[in-house]
Amino acid sequence: MRIAYFITPHGFGHAARAAAVMKAIHQFHPSVHFDIYTLVPPWFFEESIPGIFTYHETLTDIGLVQDTPLEVDIPATILALQDFFPFNEKNLIGLEKELCQSNCQLVICDISPLGIAVGEKAKIPSILIENFTWDWIYEPYIKDHPQFIDIIRTIKYYIDTANYHIQTLPTCRPD
């Protein structure tokens, strides 16, 4: 069985969680092979899950553009998001073909809406795993940057499109 795993490159925490999930799945089903789609470098996965994945260098998510670990560049984030959404149809078709040709039977996404879109296009079930989603991260910026409204709407659509939604603890949510 092959599982496609789309992982946001915004920090290694998501990749660490994804590696732990893949390792646990592989322990229960040793025949599973993962196709990892991300910009997180492959060396990050090689030590924890060696030999059970194929790496595909893919921009799966924008997150926030940061000048430093604590400084966010909102105008650059908006530009990057407007370039990323809506998804490029040619890119979606290419990823759909890859998943179908490799006989992927499931798409798992660690907060990456791209994987959900590809799963939907390929008619492959998708699972969203998250402890936060980008829509609510962007919401406080709407007042000064209304460009986020359409971006948030698009992200919420894909969150709702996932066949399964797993929210992990601790959950980061606005109250």
Give, region by region, the residue ranges found by the protein language model.
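Short amphipathic alpha-helix
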Residues: 15-26
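An aromatic- and histidine-rich active-site surface loop
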Residues: 42-44, 107-122
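Structural motif
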Residues: 2, 105-106, 164
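Short N-terminal targeting/anchoring amphipathic segment
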Residues: 96-112
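Short N-terminal binding/cap micro-motifs at the start of the first secondary-structure element
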Residues: 12-16, 44-45
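Conserved nucleotide-sugar phosphate-binding/catalytic loop shared by glycosyltransferases and other
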Residues: 32-86
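Nucleotide-activated donor-dependent transferases that construct or modify glycoconjugates
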Residues: 1-11
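Active-site-proximal region of nucleotide-activated glycan assembly enzymes
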Residues: 125-175
